[in-house]
Curated annotation (Swiss-Prot):
Function, in words: This reaction introduces a second double bond into the aromatic ring system.
Summary of subunit composition and partner proteins: Homotetramer.
Residues that coordinate or bind FMN: 125-127, 243-244, 283, 298-302, 324
Protein name stated in the entry: Chorismate synthase
Pathway(s) annotated for this protein in UniProt: Metabolic intermediate biosynthesis; chorismate biosynthesis; chorismate from D-erythrose 4-phosphate and phosphoenolpyruvate: step 7/7
Cofactors (names): FMNH2
Cofactor annotation comment: Reduced FMN (FMNH(2)).
SUPFAM superfamilies: Chorismate synthase, AroC
Keywords: Amino-acid biosynthesis, Aromatic amino acid biosynthesis, FAD, Flavoprotein, FMN, Lyase, NADP
PANTHER family the record matches: CHORISMATE SYNTHASE
TM segment ranges: none
Family as reported in the entry's similarity comment: Belongs to the chorismate synthase family.
Entry EC no(s): 4.2.3.5
Gene designation: aroC
């Protein structure tokens, strides 16, 4: 199975399955002499891990990361950093009913058709549980970006179902508020509506989609490698690689269809840009403005409402998904999206520094 790595100079490779012994990753390209320990990584994992609130899956996992290599006496050595997270709260028996059935809307069918075999326990490799290691690697990238370049990568949930937050001025977002509620939401009035919606969904045994935004501030000018490794292209690639993501927007995204050139162009003065419709990227290269990316996540198909599907013999069957699942996968996707953004930014920063130097 290919496709387990991302990045060139800062390269992340993950391995492991939802109900396997452990998850792991190898991170290559971390510059030497950066102070690093598990304590630097754990906070982001705690934001993503299951069972932290009544709005997410009740599966309980400590998600305690262990650094295996690449750190000596509290500092990175420049060699590969290996990390693992052991799986604990496994209830594989919940998935016995789908051993020979395909869950609608999941990767069961495509994995079986491609490989002729699949780990049906919680989706195996296709489970969002794998993203724990992306968050671990992303925490390293975020730390280096913050300490060496002052770059901050943060995200917030902007919509669940038809409930939208109030329009946000990026420079005025209260990030303390975002981290102080289980929805990663900057709008307290929307938090209350999110709460009501999720409660109803759990009663109905149903799920819902979501939209979230990632903001990277203080990004240096010049990151991106036109024409095929444009910064926005690589960000879209990384964010689309997150489970359940069905759309990515950079800057104003699809809204540009209704804009005129006089409105959309980000005019400039000696003091800087007058707007940021482009989302901090022009010609595939960072402008120095905040980089803004928004992703849409589909509603999970793991619901208790009966649905039609087929089995391995292509016979029609009815399926009720058992196990423990999120009514809205977008809630826990915020730290994942932050991690993928940070991984791409650090990779491009190292590539830019290698070719052009940093001014």
């Amino acid at each position: 199975m290919a496709g387990n790595s991302i990045g060139q100079l800062f390269r992340v490779t993950t391995f492991g399955e939802s109900h396997g012994i452990a998850l792991g990753c190898i991170v290559d390209g971390v510059p030497p002499n950066m102070a690093l320990s598990e304590a630097d990584i754990q906070p982001d994992l705690d934001r993503r891990k299951p069972g932290t609130s009544r709005y997410t899956t009740p599966r309980r996992e400590d998600d305690e990361v262990q650094i295996l290599s690449g750190v000596f006496e509290g500092k990175t050595t420049g060699t590969s950093i290996g990390m693992i997270i052991k799986n604990g709260d496994q209830r594989s028996k919940d998935y016995g009913d789908i051993m020979d059935k395909f869950r609608p809307g999941h990767a069961d069918y495509t994995y079986q058709q491609k490989y002729g075999i699949r780990d049906y326990r919680g989706g195996g490799r296709s489970s969002a549980r794998e993203t724990a290691m992306r968050v671990a690697a992303g925490a390293i990238a975020k730390k280096y970006l913050r300490e060496q370049f002052g770059v901050e990568v943060r995200g917030f949930l902007s919509q669940i179902g038809d409930v939208k937050i109030a329009p946000q001025n990026i420079s005025e977002i209260d990030w303390a508020q975002v981290n102080d509620n289980p929805f990663f939401c900057p709008d307290q009035s929307a938090v209350e509506k999110f709460d009501e919606l999720i409660r109803q969904l759990k009663k109905d045994g149903d799920s819902i989609g979501a939209k979230l935004t990632v903001v990277a501030e203080n990004v240096p000018v010049g990151l991106g490698e036109p024409v095929f490794d444009r910064l926005d292209a690589d960000l879209a690639h990384a964010l689309m690689g997150i489970n359940a993501v069905k759309a990515v927007e950079i800057g104003d995204g699809f809204a540009v269809v209704e804009q005129r050139g006089t409105q959309h162009r980000d005019e400039m003065t000696p003091q800087g840009f007058l707007s940021n419709h482009a989302g901090g990227i022009l010609g595939g290269i960072s402008t120095g403005q905040p980089i803004i990316a928004t992703i849409a996540l589909k509603p999970t198909s793991s619901i208790t409402v009966p649905g039609r599907t087929v089995n391995l013999n292509n016979e029609p069957v009815e399926l009720i998904t058992k196990g423990r699942h999120d009514p809205c996968v977008g809630i826990r996707a915020v730290p994942i999206a932050e991690a993928m953004t940070a991984i791409v930014l650090l990779d491009h920063l190292l590539r830019h520094r290698a070719q052009c130097g940093l001014k």
